[in-house]
Design a protein with these regions (language model features):
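Class I SAM-dependent methyltransferase Rossmann-like catalytic core
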Residues: 1-37
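Soluble or luminal CAZymes and related metallo-dependent hydrolases
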Residues: 20-28, 53, 123, 185-192
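Conserved class I S-adenosyl-L-methionine
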Residues: 139-168
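Short glycine/proline- and acidic residue-enriched helix-loop micro-motifs
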Residues: 14-15, 173-183
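Short amphipathic alpha-helical segments and helix-helix/interface helices
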Residues: 29, 33, 57-62, 128-129, ...
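Core SAM-dependent methyltransferase catalytic element
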Residues: 205-228
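Short alpha-helix
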Residues: 181-201
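Conserved SAM-binding loop
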Residues: 42-148, 223-226
Length: 228
């Protein structure tokens, strides 16, 4: 199984950028704690767990080590994480758009920086729908904001504001053959997330716009099933 990486390394400043990423994600984790019912007794599944062991990734696993009811689902082989995160109850390999879990299996379904990597807009709809189906209470999903001036995957500014077909053609021309494929990168803006909510007939949700410095770098969608 081929493990994927969605982070373009930048010479000389890569470690600095990873520190910024970690800081940003820890701020988002604070929003998670503030806006959900999470406690150390909740059952939670992280969908889209990465095999990358750098501390800027898998923040949710780092911050929940007192909880013995945490599971992970990834399309990559994440067995290597068992040693680093011994508190994790279950590691699953599968497709977040279509899982084998029963309805309402987990108190909270969590997914960080995965939605933009599941492919087409229809795939993104299916992904959110599946997260909602297997959650009993809440869904917490983060994704980079296409409206931000820079794409943090490629580290290129403004280019992703072009129509997506043109954006992908340019990425291919300048050597970003991985990111030029919709199946690997399909950024969303707030309007797109609202459209997905309407398609899925989800009414009890809120979208937070997380800022890095003065820029709205990340979108966070929180769905509360107790009222839907």
């Amino acid at each position: 199984m081929r493990n994927l990486t969605y982070w373009v390394k930048v010479p000389f400043i890569n470690n600095y950028l990873l520190k910024i990423l970690k800081y940003n994600r820890e701020k988002i984790h604070n929003l998670f704690l503030k806006n959900t019912i999470y406690n150390d007794n909740c059952s939670l599944i992280d969908i889209g767990t990465t095999v990358d062991t750098n501390n800027s990734h898998n923040i949710i696993l780092q911050k929940t080590q007192k909880n013995k009811n945490i599971s992970c689902l990834s399309n990559q082989d994440i067995d290597s994480l068992k040693k680093k995160f011994p508190h994790i109850k279950d590691f699953y390999i599968g497709d977040g758009k279509k899982t084998d879990f029963d309805d309402n299996t987990y108190d909270i379904v969590y997914s960080s920086a995965t939605l933009e990597h599941v492919g087409s807009f229809q795939n993104q709809i299916n992904f959110i729908n599946e997260c909602t189906r297997i959650s009993k209470y809440q869904i917490f999903i983060t994704t980079p904001n296409r409206s931000c001036f820079i794409d943090f995957h490629t580290k290129l500014p403004f280019l992703h504001w072009l129509p997506k077909k043109i954006h992908r053609k340019i990425l291919k021309l300048i050597g970003y053959k991985f990111y030029c494929l919709e199946e690997n990168l399909n950024l969303l803006d707030k309007k797109s997330l609202i459209k997905i909510m309407k398609i899925l007939n989800i009414t009890n949700f809120k979208i937070l716009e997380h800022k890095f410095l003065i820029f709205k770098s990340n979108l966070i969608i929180i769905i509360d099933k107790k009222i839907n």
